[in-house]
Amino acid sequence: MTGASGNVMDCFKNAFGAVGEICARAPGRVEVLGNHTDYNEGYTLSCAIDKEVYVAAGKSEASGAFELASTHFSQTVKVKTVEQQRENAWVNYPLGVYKVLKDRGYPVGPFKLAIDSSVPLGAGLSSSAALEVATGLALSGLFHFTIEPAELAKVCQKAENSFVGANCGLLDQFSSIFGKKNHVLFIEYRHLEHETIPIADPDLTLAVTISGVSHSLVTSAYNDRRKECFGAAEYFHKRDPKKTALRDVSMEELKAA
């Protein structure tokens, strides 16, 4: 293997002294239109980018432990109990995906995992969602089960919500799974419908610039904004039970409140 896939397989072999049984990848994403609109049952426009997370995986049933390595971190992490890790917090993303899959009855077991990423960390390009999706794809191949793409997105979102502690919507995971080259992705969140729209103009280029400002859903005010949005939705729902999300509230109603 060459490139990023070769890097992650080398990482696996260096960390665990064996060849990874399977390799999976998932792209980061850029948000074109829509911010905090996914969990308010609104609409977004996004696209996948040409930076990806690669995951190599193998079973570790003999030891019963979970072992994780990354090209971005020097330490190989070994855990026997699947619980949130305060140190080496990056392992919470794949461990969370495992836990949600296990809780939902998928036949997953202990694993060894190596990670390589060209998605800049903390740049707001959803490296965490790409890692979750790549982990889910790797585990489905490793343990021989099928999972529908939309269900995988929900599994990854649940992992980030309940295990990592970031109350994200589905924008990031959906974009990583359904994004397509030279297309933007339109997502409607009340019914979870999506459409890939071709970029018709061949001369159109979407440039993404790294600002240098680090971003984290866990430590930022993201969870506070979500709580505030849900509080506002509850306010309007009490006055009109038909309004179940901020999507249902007009600008005039917001201004009047």
Q: What residues fall within each predicted segment?
A:
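Short Gly/aromatic-enriched secondary-structure transition segments
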Residues: 41-48, 225-226
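C-terminal nucleotide
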Residues: 2-29, 54-87, 183-257
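Short, amphipathic alpha-helical segments that act as regulatory/interfacial helices
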Residues: 49, 98, 230-233
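N-terminal cofactor/phosphate-binding cores enriched in small/glycine residues
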Residues: 34-36, 48-49
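Residues at beta-strand starts and edge strands
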Residues: 51, 109, 113, 203-205
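Short amphipathic alpha-helical segments with coiled-coil-like heptad repeat character
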Residues: 39-41, 237-238
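Short, charge-rich binding segments
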Residues: 46-48, 56-60, 105
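Gly/Ser-rich oxyanion-binding loop with an adjacent helix/lid
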Residues: 1-22, 27-30, 34, 40-43, ...
